[in-house]
Every structure is written in C-alpha cells, then in structure tokens.
C-alpha cells in the first residue's frame, strides 16, 4: 500500500485464480517475466510514487489471467475455478499525473488472454510525485507490473 514519502498501490485487492491461491499457474506468453505476470492487483485505483522532479519513463505490464489455460503437469491438485467476477473483457482508462494516457484500454482485446502487453510513456514529473490512475469503463481495472525509470 502507498506510504507518504515512498510508493505503493492505492485500492484494489490481490487476484486469486482459485480460493487460497495467489495468482495463477497458467503460462503467460510474450514475456520473460512469467512469475511477475502470473499475479496482478485487481480493481486498483492508483499507483503513486513520491520521487524527485525530473523526466521518467513509465512502463505498465498487463495480462488478462482469466482466459482458459492449459493444465500444468506439476500442478495436478489445483482446482481451476474462479472466485469473484470474470474480468476478461475489462475495459479501463489510465492517466498519469492527471493526463489521459490509455483510453478504453483492454489487454484481452489487444492481445488475448494469458499474454503480456506492455505500455510505455515518458513524462516530466513536477511536484515530487508520479501518480498512475485507473478508471473502470467495463469490468474491473487491473495491473500486473509497473516499472519506473529516471531518464538523465
């Protein structure tokens, strides 16, 4: 969670593919960071970083984890059920420091299920913080990973 003077998420909850299990064992394609993309924060409101003013690159990583996936041989005891709502087909808006960035964005529509899609943006930070806001249009917002790089 966000802590003033530091960084963190605001709102949302951990994605659980089946009761008692964080994330999914499904293979996520189009990434070398499979373990990272097998988890996500769902219904996230924002991610905030308190950092020095300057130029930064923001990279957001998404993967819709609710598509049917192949059964994993080493995970024979897993129960392949979903709790809560089906998030496939979620559509949401993303803004950075109040500036609209991704409008009516849907990872499932762009690349399909269990596939990574990355979105990058360069931004000048003033006022000591960088905030990425998420707004649901249909379904829920979600985020699998975030990277922030300072550009010198």
Each predicted region: which residue ranges?
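Compositionally biased, intrinsically disordered or flexible polar/acidic segments
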Residues: 1-152
């Amino acid at each position: 969670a966000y802590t003033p003077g530091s960084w963190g998420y605001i709102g949302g909850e951990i994605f659980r593919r089946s009761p008692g299990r964080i994330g999914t064992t499904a293979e996520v394609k189009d990434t070398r960071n499979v373990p990272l993309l097998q988890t996500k924060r769902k219904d996230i409101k924002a991610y905030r970083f308190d950092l020095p003013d300057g130029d930064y690159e923001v990279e957001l990583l998404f993967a819709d984890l609710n598509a049917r996936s192949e059964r994993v041989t080493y995970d024979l005891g897993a129960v392949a059920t979903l709790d809560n709502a089906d998030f496939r087909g979620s559509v949401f808006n993303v803004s950075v420091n109040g500036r609209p960035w991704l409008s009516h964005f849907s990872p499932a529509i762009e690349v399909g299920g269990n596939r990574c899609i990355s979105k990058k943006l360069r931004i000048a930070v003033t006022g000591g913080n960088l905030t990425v806001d998420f707004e649901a249009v249909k379904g829920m917002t979600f985020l699998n990973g975030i990277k922030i790089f300072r550009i010198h």
